[in-house]
Amino acid sequence: MPYLEPYLKKRIDSKLQQLQSLRPLSYASVVKLKEQFRIEMTYNSNAIEGNKLTLKETFLVINEGLTIKGKSLKDHLEAKDHYEALNYLYEFVEKDSLHTVSEVFLRNLQQLVVRETDPDWAGRYRIGDVIITGSDHIPPDANSVPYLMNDLIKWVRNNKRKMHSIELAAIFHHRIVFIHPFFDGNGRTARLAMNLILMQKGYPLVVMLKNDRKRYYDSLVKADRGDYLPFIRFTAQAVERSLNMYLKTLLPESKTKEKYYPLSEISNKTPYSEKYLNLLIRQGKIEAHKEKRNWLTSIEAVERYIKGRMRRRKIPTKT
């Protein structure tokens, strides 16, 4: 049975509660954060699939309508399409925060994701078999796709109150890419659709980073084999990153005292090497977030891990 590790669950639940306690949130701050996340997710989700636009170029294409020299038309169209799909997601949640996941919602999302790059198959399930380049996974026969998608939606509805929303969202994400219901846009659609479940529970938009692409795909492969824990952990850490960014912006300065540093600096001030800190972070045991390719954490986060470890071993702390 997949599960969210207790220490990670406790940390995330606490941060979500902290964010909820700040409501009503500053309108100006939320608008700014949402726009930042829209651009960031559009860039990262497309880049995971091979889009060549940089983060800055993605911003310029969407907000300034610029054409980037040396980048393909497809790269430009994918950025615009994904941004529109994100707008649809936000509007969907804001219009009815309790709306249940449905096949219509998924098909509408995918239709927007590939509207300009694959218009003939936008919003339609595939009718032929497909091979995923670079993957050993062979998606189910095309004839079974409608039945599998119907079963998936029923599964989500049946488990909505039985599972933690992060577990539910992660497994839902995996099942979409496993079934591969569309000819194109499956990964981007799955990353968007997962967010419906999370945003309905009050989480900010969750972005899976291009720099974590290998870990993302490795954990999906393990989920293909029935081991969901790595992908649930990966998803949870992405959730925590979004919560951290919101809290950092919205909390009063006096309540955000922790400063985050690269692991090379933290290792000089704590008992652990940079390599071991990296391992603990990847396991979700120490709170951290990524900036570009580097993990950042705080001395306080390491100290909390040490104290928790001592309590579990029933070793008294110094007074």
Where is each model-derived feature located?
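FIC/Doc superfamily catalytic core
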Residues: 1-184, 188-319
